[in-house]
């Protein structure tokens, strides 16, 4: 769910930027847990080569979800040595999700219904999240600045 324009939060030096289930505090840390539900990519030769490599990795890891394959190949030396791609992981403070919700509604740009099994569970918690956002947006500027606001989710998605 998009709450505000995320483009100001993208890294200008990165070719490929991806949201995280869990962010470790460093956007360069390859040990971050990527979530392929939200990706910002610059179209260039590096990213084209990277996507070809990622796509063919399905042959190396048959039956594996694309996100799980990415978790395997992100350590492959081919990516750094041959593509030259600059990969950055997006901070959950701005690009949160049910795994690690953004705690500051003054910062959050997007929230993802990740770490949640079942469509009904996702829809329920997304509705709650939207209601939380509406309550936050109804606050005055002073209330937003002085009163910490956070989500009441996840509830069904735990």
Please tell me what each predicted stretch does.
Residues 41-158:
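Catalytic core and acceptor-binding pocket of nucleotide-sugar-dependent glycosyltransferases
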């Amino acid at each position: 769910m998009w709450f505000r324009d995320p483009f100001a939060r993208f890294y200008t030096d990165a070719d490929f930027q991806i949201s995280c289930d869990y962010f470790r505090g460093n956007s360069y840390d390859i040990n971050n847990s990527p979530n392929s539900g939200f990706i910002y990519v610059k179209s260039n030769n590096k990213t084209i080569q990277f996507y070809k490599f990622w796509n063919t990795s399905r042959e190396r890891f048959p039956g594996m979800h694309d996100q799980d394959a990415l978790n395997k190949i992100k350590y492959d030396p081919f990516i750094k040595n041959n593509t030259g791609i600059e990969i950055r992981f997006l901070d959950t403070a701005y690009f949160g999700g049910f795994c690690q919700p953004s705690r500051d509604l003054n910062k959050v740009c997007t929230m993802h219904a990740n770490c949640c099994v079942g469509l009904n569970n996702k829809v329920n918690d997304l509705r709650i999240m939207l209601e939380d956002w509406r309550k936050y947006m109804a606050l005055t500027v002073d209330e937003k600045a002085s009163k910490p606001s956070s989500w009441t989710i996840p509830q069904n998605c735990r």
